[in-house]
């Protein structure tokens, strides 16, 4: 009985530790200040409140222990409401959402900052992960839901600056995962 109780207690502790995996989100303004002290790239999760795949990415990808640890160590992470009412300043430019309708359920007006950073071939989709370098230059937006094991090579490709010397397909041919937790 003691052995079963010990196993259950250990399992509960491990489950609690895994469920506590969490990305340290900051505002876009905070990220810009933090870069001045310790340069890192910025990762922006561009989401909407009505987007199902955005919610899945939050629940499964950003709460994955390996993923959240890697992001926290190597990036400043920003969670950005693509249709939100809040203004922001990025690279000394003010962005607003003049068309935002307070209290509206469902889709709302797209924020100017979203329009500046998230389009791929002129189209905005959610979720979009936007990567920005230490000098506040846009590296790339990546649209669509990413599972933790799909997100790992992307995080490393950007962090290791492989995008400067390799194309994505060539990188993926030789990519080896070093995830030490169960894929989610």
Description of each model-found segment:
Residues 38-55, 77:
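Short active-site neighborhood of thiol/selenol oxidoreductases, capturing the structured segment around
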Residues 28-32, 65-68, 72-128, 132-140, ...:
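Thioredoxin-like thiol-disulfide oxidoreductase module
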Residues 49-63, 135:
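Periplasmic/extracellular electron-transfer cofactor-ligation site
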Residues 47, 58, 81-84, 144-146:
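A mature extracytoplasmic/lumenal domain signature
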Residues 21-22, 56, 105-107:
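Short, flexible loop segments at the rims of nucleotide/cofactor-binding pockets, characterized by
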Residues 19-34:
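N-terminal "domain-start" segment that seeds a small globular fold
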Residues 23-24, 36, 40, 117, ...:
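Non-globular targeting/processing and membrane-anchoring segments
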Residues 1-23:
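Bacterial Sec-dependent N-terminal signal peptides
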